[in-house]
């Protein structure tokens, strides 16, 4: 299915009864082909979706709430278009379920079917809300650099590494990522963490490269994969991991993670802007 056929940018009818058919899958393959990603994938990882506006009725008609987290594997053939995800979650609001476990089971079944892969789902009930943490991405901030930047279309030529120098291990972060929805043109704001082992990457060039996404159109997952492959090709690190946390829209935030080496799943602590 193509993004232009999705609910994005169209008049919306909000369903008030559970409806799994509202989920609109979008194949990953098309966007990957555009940037030269084929099989085998040069990375693995997860897309972490947090849904803050989930509610349903219990068997006695009393509303229940929870925060849902979805872990979608990067190797899944499809992603779910975000507005369709919002409409799907909204369809739970007037539907009775026996338990939170029954809601979680329905979410796992439906989203896994849409993505054509096994999706992990976790629910945080109100009793657990105080345990949820807020934190910023760890690393050396690129935003400390005082530089000129005038290119706002993606330009990987900014990416360079000093291959004659000794390898380093660095974690770099920036809060200056902005891209745009390919269907509606709405801005998407994010923070990015880049961890690598290899020849030292030029910090100013890396920041200018991230800034060059400012007028770029692409879904969150696609932007992170573009960042990953551009750095991998231009700088040739031995190890590379890219993690982005995008601000919330429609009660959902999307946080893609891509890596080419085994490591623990990144924390799912929301940032201040989320």
From Swiss-Prot:
A Gene Ontology molecular function term of the record: preQ1 synthase activity
Keywords of the record: Cytoplasm, NADP, Oxidoreductase, Queuosine biosynthesis
Major localization listed first in the record, in broad terms: cytoplasm
TM segment ranges: none
Binding site for substrate: 80-82, 220-221
EC number(s) from the headed UniProt entry: 1.7.1.13
Binding of NADPH, residues: 82-83, 249-250
GO biological-process terms attached to the record: queuosine biosynthetic process; tRNA modification
A cellular-component GO term for this protein: cytoplasm
Subcellular localization, as worded in the UniProt entry: Cytoplasm
Keyword rRNA-binding: no
Catalytic reaction equation(s): 7-aminomethyl-7-carbaguanine + 2 NADP(+) = 7-cyano-7-deazaguanine + 2 NADPH + 3 H(+)
Top-level taxon of origin: Bacteria
Keyword Cytoplasm found: yes
Active site residues per record: 181, 188
Pathway: tRNA modification; tRNA-queuosine biosynthesis
Cross-referenced NCBIfam families: QueF
Family statement: Belongs to the GTP cyclohydrolase I family. QueF type 2 subfamily.
Function: Catalyzes the NADPH-dependent reduction of 7-cyano-7-deazaguanine (preQ0) to 7-aminomethyl-7-deazaguanine (preQ1).
Subunit structure: Homodimer.
Name of the protein in question: NADPH-dependent 7-cyano-7-deazaguanine reductase
Record organism: Burkholderia pseudomallei (strain K96243)
Gene behind this protein: queF
């Amino acid at each position: 299915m193509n993004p232009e056929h999705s609910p994005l940018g169209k008049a919306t009818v909000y369903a008030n009864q559970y409806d799994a058919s509202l989920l609109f899958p979008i194949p990953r393959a098309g966007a990957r082909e555009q940037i030269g990603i084929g099989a085998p994938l040069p990375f693995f990882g997860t897309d972490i979706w947090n849904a803050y506006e989930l509610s349903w009725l219990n068997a006695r008609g009393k509303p229940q709430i929870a925060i849902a987290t979805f872990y979608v594997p990067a190797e899944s053939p499809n992603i779910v278009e975000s507005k369709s995800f919002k409409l799907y979650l909204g369809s739970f609001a007037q539907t009775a379920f026996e338990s939170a476990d029954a809601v979680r089971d329905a979410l796992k079944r439906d989203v896994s079917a849409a993505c054509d892969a096994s999706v992990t789902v976790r629910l945080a009930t109100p009793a657990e809300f105080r345990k949820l943490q807020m934190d910023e991405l760890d690393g050396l901030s690129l935003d400390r650099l005082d530089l000129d930047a005038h290119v706002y279309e993606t330009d990987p030529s900014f990416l360079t590494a000093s291959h004659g120098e000794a390898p380093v291990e660095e974690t770099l972060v920036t809060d200056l990522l902005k891209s745009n929805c390919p269907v509606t043109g709405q801005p998407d704001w994010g923070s990015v963490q880049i961890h690598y082992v290899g020849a030292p990457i030029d910090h100013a060039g890396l920041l200018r490269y991230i800034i060059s996404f400012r007028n770029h159109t692409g879904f969150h997952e696609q932007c992170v994969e573009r960042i990953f492959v551009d750095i991998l090709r231009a700088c040739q690190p031995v190890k590379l991991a890219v993690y982005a946390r995008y601000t919330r829209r429609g009660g959902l935030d999307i946080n893609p993670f891509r890596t080419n080496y085994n490591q623990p799943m990144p924390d799912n602590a929301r940032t201040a802007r989320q």
